[in-house]
């Protein structure tokens, strides 16, 4: 997270409290990054609002500028601004959709998680992060190089946030149910699966100092266990990742992040591998 030099903050002019800006200011002060405030709107001029918010951030000692623009949709507008302004993180307040609307249309926040060429922090509430818990969600059953790098990125970002807020780091990984038909004896017994995941977690628990009572390895689907544990420990932030798939439509996020977004009470930081981010950025530049 220390490498982020500019943060794009999506400003919702219809909201009285700008909680995304509150989070961005906390992070910017800690990592000494700049802020760029963005209003996605073309029907009304919000220059005075942006000027006021920019001046407030500047008064707090944060380098800040702003813009208002619109390109066919909110996600497209944000993504273009990320590339134009050279931002390494997007912070946006989550806008929940009704079940009916989600059944008919892809929620705008889901689109942003899928296609944004930078990590995205979705802010779910205005609660203070200070001295809170941070949950890093990884898949200890995936051992390829891309997942390994992504896992380390997830846990290192979570550890950075813990340092920033004097918080407690938790680690979660869901494992599958035993399968008697599995060719690998490890996956035929529940105990051996759990032991395998426990062994794999050692790399992260040792490196980042995760206490054993803060390690959560259990059987079940990730999109069920992650919200359950996050809500149980009262997590301030949940950090998750996705390995994208390249194709004509661009890189697609795994739906775990989308599903848990609405189930979590905590803020959600979604990370992608560097090659996926580069692919998305190249699509925007075409």
Region annotations inferred by a language model:
Residues 93-111, 240-263:
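Glycine-rich, Arg-bearing micro-motifs that act as flexible, cationic patches
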Residues 36-38, 65-69, 121, 170-172, ...:
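General small-molecule cofactor/ligand-binding pocket signal
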Residues 1-18, 88-89, 94, 104, ...:
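Intrinsically disordered or low-complexity boundary/linker segments at protein termini
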Residues 1-49, 133-184, 207-210, 268, ...:
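Small/aliphatic-rich secondary-structure junction motif
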């Amino acid at each position: 997270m220390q490498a982020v030099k500019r943060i794009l903050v999506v400003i919702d002019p219809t909201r009285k409290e700008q909680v995304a800006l509150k989070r961005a200011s906390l992070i910017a002060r800690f990592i000494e990054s700049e802020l760029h405030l963005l209003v996605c709107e073309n029907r009304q001029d919000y220059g005075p609002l942006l000027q006021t918010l920019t001046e407030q951030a500047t008064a707090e000692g944060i380098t800040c500028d702003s813009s208002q623009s619109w390109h066919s949709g909110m996600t497209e507008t944000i993504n273009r601004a990320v590339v134009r302004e050279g931002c390494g993180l997007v912070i946006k307040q989550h806008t929940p959709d009704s079940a009916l609307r989600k059944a008919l249309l892809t929620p705008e926040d889901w689109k942003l998680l899928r296609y944004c060429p930078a990590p995205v922090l979705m802010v779910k509430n205005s609660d203070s992060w200070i001295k809170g818990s941070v949950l890093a969600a990884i898949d200890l059953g995936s051992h390829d190089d891309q997942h390994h790098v992504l896992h380390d990125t997830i846990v290192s970002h979570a550890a950075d946030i813990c340092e920033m807020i004097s918080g407690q780091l938790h680690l979660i990984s869901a494992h599958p149910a035993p399968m008697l038909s599995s060719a690998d004896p490890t996956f035929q017994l529940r105990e051996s699966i759990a032991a395998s995941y426990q062994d794999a977690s050692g790399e992260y628990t040792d490196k980042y100092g995760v206490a054993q009572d803060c390690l959560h390895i259990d059987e079940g689907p990730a999109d069920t266990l992650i919200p359950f544990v996050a809500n149980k420990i009262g997590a301030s932030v949940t950090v998750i990742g996705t390995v994208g798939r390249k194709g004509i439509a661009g890189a697609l996020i795994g739906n775990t992040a989308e599903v848990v977004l609405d189930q979590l009470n905590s803020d959600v930081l979604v990370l992608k591998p560097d090659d996926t981010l580069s692919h998305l950025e190249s699509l925007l530049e075409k």
